[in-house]
Structure formats: structure tokens, C-alpha cells
Amino acid sequence: MTPALDTALNAADGALRTLFAKPQASRTCPTVAGQRTELSTQEKALSGALMRVNHVGEVCAQALYAAQAVTTRDPALRRHFLAASREEGDHLAWTRERLDELGARPSLLNPLWYAGAFGLGLLAGRLGDRVSLGFVVETERQVEAHLASHLERLPEGDHDSRAIVAQMKDDEARHAQDAQNAGALPMPAPVKALMQASARLMTTTAHYL
């Protein structure tokens, strides 16, 4: 098997696992036993929509890190991307489990989100490792801000969702700092604006679909 074919097969396997297999977390879910509160129908619907958006974000994170791990030629940086991907995999598992508990479904457009994020990750990776790391920094900072807004919007009684989102927010901030420390280049203002616009489109659509 050629290296290129091996890489392609691994990428396809990762996509299928992310989109169709039940995710398994390597860390314990941060929810606290005994804090569960009965939510109203409206509160469950709101939490379900917000957690669906967060689940989409984790689908995209798997795609981004997979693409960047494929494109880098630096073994240490590849290990960095894969380690971050494993933590994002925990987020994927936690958000999916919480969706099930809330009686909500994942986004119907997850294959589209994955494909788009994988393409962006490939593009960033082709522009060089420092650009790729800069893309990680900006992505994670935007995700951190987005999660902070969800902590303000989630029902006060939804302790489980709030605990998950709070842990995710902390992890995303650390991922951004790790990428910055690894030598990330800052993204130009137009690129940041385009990323924000794309994120708004995704989150608005995923809220309903």
C-alpha cells in the first residue's frame, strides 16, 4: 500500500467514524451526579438546539485536525494535532450523549459540515505549518467565545449541558494557547472576518437543522 493511499484510507475511516459511529470518550463526562433538574419542554428544546450546534462544532473539529495532521510533514506537529483531536473526540462524545438525553438529534447536515471543515483544514495545511497553527488559534478562540455565549443562553437548571460546555470552553482555550506557543502566525483581518461569517452561517443553520 502506498503512503498516499494509506493516508486517504485513514482519512476516510476517520470521517466515517465521526459521522456514523457512536463516539467514545477517553475522559469522564464533566456532569455532576445529583445536580440534574427537570427541564420544561421549552428549556429542553433550547438546550437541544444549542447542544446540536456544539456537536456540529466538534464534528468540524475532527475534520480540521484530521486534515491538518495529514498535511503537516513535522512528526511532532502531527502528534500535537492528533492529541488535540482526541480531546475534541471527548467533546464529540459528550455532546452526542447529551443530545440523546435531551431527546434531540444531531444536525442533518453533518456530512456537509465535515467535508467543508476538512477542505479548510487541507487548505490551511498546504499553506504551511505556521499558517495551519494560526488557523487553529483563530478557530479555537472563536469557538471559545461561542461557548461562552452558550453558557449565557443555556437554562440555569440545565446543569449537565452547562458543565459540558464549561469544560469544552476551557479545553478550547488551552488548544488555542498550545497552537500559539507552537509558532502560529496571526490570521489577517479579512480571513478572521470570513471565518466568523462562515461560523455564523453554520451555527444558525445547525440550530434548526
Swiss-Prot record:
InterPro entries the record matches: COQ7_proteobact, Ferritin-like, Ferritin-like_SF, Ubq_synth_Coq7
Record's keyword terms, sorted: Cell membrane, Iron, Membrane, Metal-binding, Monooxygenase, Oxidoreductase, Ubiquinone biosynthesis
Membrane topology annotation: Peripheral membrane protein
Binding residues annotated for Fe cation 2, in chain numbering: 88, 140, 172, 175
Cellular component annotations (GO), alphabetically ordered: plasma membrane
Any single GO BP term: ubiquinone biosynthetic process
Reaction catalyzed: a 5-methoxy-2-methyl-3-(all-trans-polyprenyl)benzene-1,4-diol + AH2 + O2 = a 3-demethylubiquinol + A + H2O
Pathway involvement of the protein, from the record: Cofactor biosynthesis; ubiquinone biosynthesis
Enzyme class: oxidoreductase
Domain of life where this protein originates: Bacteria
Cofactor note: Binds 2 iron ions per subunit.
Pfam families (UniProt xref): COQ7
Location in the cell: Cell membrane
Main localization, broad class: membrane
Enzyme nomenclature, EC number: 1.14.99.60
Function of the molecule: Catalyzes the hydroxylation of 2-nonaprenyl-3-methyl-6-methoxy-1,4-benzoquinol during ubiquinone biosynthesis.
HAMAP family (UniProt xref): COQ7
Family annotation (PANTHER family): 5-DEMETHOXYUBIQUINONE HYDROXYLASE, MITOCHONDRIAL, COENZYME Q10 BIOSYNTHESIS PROTEIN 7
Family: Belongs to the COQ7 family.
Protein name: 3-demethoxyubiquinol 3-hydroxylase
Species in which this protein is naturally found: Polaromonas sp. (strain JS666 / ATCC BAA-500)
